[in-house]
């Protein structure tokens, strides 16, 4: 157990796990929101086949917003996340970066990127 000295709150390992996955969900929200808001179809888990077929822009906005809501819950409602707490920010950033690279590789194959 770690202690957040700013607030005196105990930081448990599962807080960091939540921040890591919060970063991953935050990263996953971006391509869906950007494509959906731009009116473009994009892959989603609801397409046929899942992750390869295209879903409507509306489905992508809804899926992107769901991912954003999950990121909010994992980052801001678990523990006491602080932007000035370097280990917490690095943990969130690691989840964001790992998911971003995975998404780039996955969608790059479909769109000619990688």
Regions found by a protein language model. Give the residues of each.
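Transmembrane alpha-helix/helix-exit interface in multi-pass inner-membrane proteins
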Residues: 25-39
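Cytosolic, membrane-interface loops and tails of multi-pass inner-membrane proteins
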Residues: 36-52
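Short, Lys/Arg-enriched N-terminal segments with co-localized hydrophobic residues
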Residues: 1-10
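Core segments of transmembrane alpha-helices
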Residues: 60-74
